[in-house]
Amino acid sequence: FGQAVEHHQQQLRLAKQLKDKQNNIQEQNNAQSSLGRCYFEQAIKAKEETSKKLFEQAVEHNLERLRLAKQLEGKNGIQEQINAQHLLGQCYFEQAMKAEGEASEQLFGQAVKHHQQQLRLAKQLEDENGIQEQINAQFSLGRCYFEQAMKAEGEASEQLFGQAVEHHQQQLRLAKQL
């Protein structure tokens, strides 16, 4: 893990030296993506306190990735923002799965927020890729609500299951367009 992080930090340093602005930004984005993924994968495997710190690092790298993606031009910029929003949503989702009570609810809320942004961006893409990205976002939203419903009780649980079903039905409608 340490060697991978070191390698990707070197990749980031080299990317910052590139003269072509768009290429520079894209390569920095790629390095931030790899760093975020390293911390994310380690956070999933780690124990509670260590896991929390690793998730924070994963979020930090993905927020930087999102900032960089907003500077990229055209469809590539939108696609990179979608990718960053997805990973941010996953970071919060995985933390929510490990948490309990109000902390879990807040983390699920953060996950939903990022997956909604992912969906909003996916709607800006045309063609089958845009539809596929919307399907991915609807799946992630449905999964968030489903897992929240599993942790909730009574009426709150029923409402969350309803929202999960709604997103998965939308996912199915989109899939029929492919």
Question: What are the language-model segments listed below?
Answer:
Residues 4, 8-11, 58-65, 111-118, ...:
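Tetratricopeptide repeat
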Residues 26-41, 79-94, 132-147:
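Conserved alpha-helical positions within TPR/SEL1-like repeat arrays
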Residues 19-20, 24, 47, 54, ...:
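Short coil/turn linker motifs that delimit alpha-helical repeat modules in TPR/alpha-solenoid proteins
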Residues 1-5, 20, 40-58, 93-111, ...:
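Short coil/turn connectors between adjacent alpha-helices in alpha-solenoid helical repeat scaffolds
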